[in-house]
């Protein structure tokens, strides 16, 4: 009798009805599809480079890891101004929107110029940081050569990427979400097509290998920028902020100060997190060049499967956030419990599929047996920890939906720099343990976050309406 009551209580707390799951999936599935398309194309892109050799693949993956830090810097840089853009648009203050756009422009220009100068002066040294492990002198020299070739071309794609982020973020904050998505899909198709033509030299196109992959990426970014910028200025009736946008590039000092106060923590958080991910990869790379190749393979595969817990986590922020805004705290807590349980359950099923299929994915790449074997086990380890990551992601967005941004900052950037990176740094440099054990230890450390997240969610520190207060 007692056991029946416990089962009934568990079911009521963590399992919803059909209507509940339909509501959750209605929010989560479109996010999964959008992220799924992007990550699947990235997988195909990665496989194309991976088919031409280990050194080419490793060189490109190292550069992409470094450019990823720049990408998130830009994202963080424009996000702070975006808070003001949305409010100005809500007030129909188009001049205010123009001013926030100009702030984004200057912030992005400063970050982009700084990044280009850094890569031109110390780019080779940054790539070399990932080549300190095992491998023959020839393999290391080839990886550095291909990485430098890839980087030199990819730098040409930073300005259009910058402009796309400025325009697309402003359009979204003004309610236009479809055009940036369409432009992104076109860019993906252009990238995929020219990757195939230029990497392998199909038809009358030259066989350029890793340089072809970089050219295809840069070309796709200019196409995306042309679509977004062109559409914005051709449809000024929809985009009133575009009228007289470049009549001046001055930004009022008081607005600049306000945006810096709100936006600097966001920029800081994104930069810290991205640089920590780059540092983790560098720590693993101490164990040899094959580790760089295997991480590239496993991370690309992981990204395809991770769309499930990422989409469900985003859904928590949307659905629970709306309930908090409506002041229905009881329903918000009940919904959150069920959504966290649903996310963990879904990701446990996905993890099983991922674990079973792990030996097959590395076979798609033209690399050596050691790199394939490492990639297989890295994918298996990630699959094992996927339910943990699903729980973490859901609790992270639960706390953020209640406005606990300081806690989420501690969760995100501070934890990875104070716990994960030191573990990887010490174990990779001062012990002889296998890289797979180091990787697993870093994943295992996230259990600390799980415990903290569980306590905070259970205590209900996130149950607040930040709009009315």
Model-derived segments and spans:
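Hydrophobic/aromatic residues within transmembrane alpha-helices of membrane transport systems
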Residues: 33, 45-49, 60, 85-90, ...
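Transmembrane helical elements of multi-pass membrane transporters/channels
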Residues: 26-45, 153, 187, 220-224, ...
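Small-residue hotspots at the loop-to-helix junctions and early N-terminal turns
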Residues: 54-65, 147, 151, 214, ...
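Generic alpha-helical transmembrane segments of integral inner-membrane proteins
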Residues: 32, 36, 40, 44, ...
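Helix-terminus/linker motif at the lipid-water interface of multi-pass membrane proteins
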Residues: 36, 40-58, 127-141, 199-208, ...
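Short alpha-helical transmembrane segments in multi-pass integral membrane proteins
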Residues: 1-28, 85-157, 207-263, 320-385, ...
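Short runs within selected transmembrane alpha-helices of multi-pass transporters and secretion channels
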Residues: 78, 153-172, 180-188, 213-229, ...
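Small-residue-rich hydrophobic transmembrane alpha-helices
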Residues: 57-117, 161-180, 281, 292-358, ...
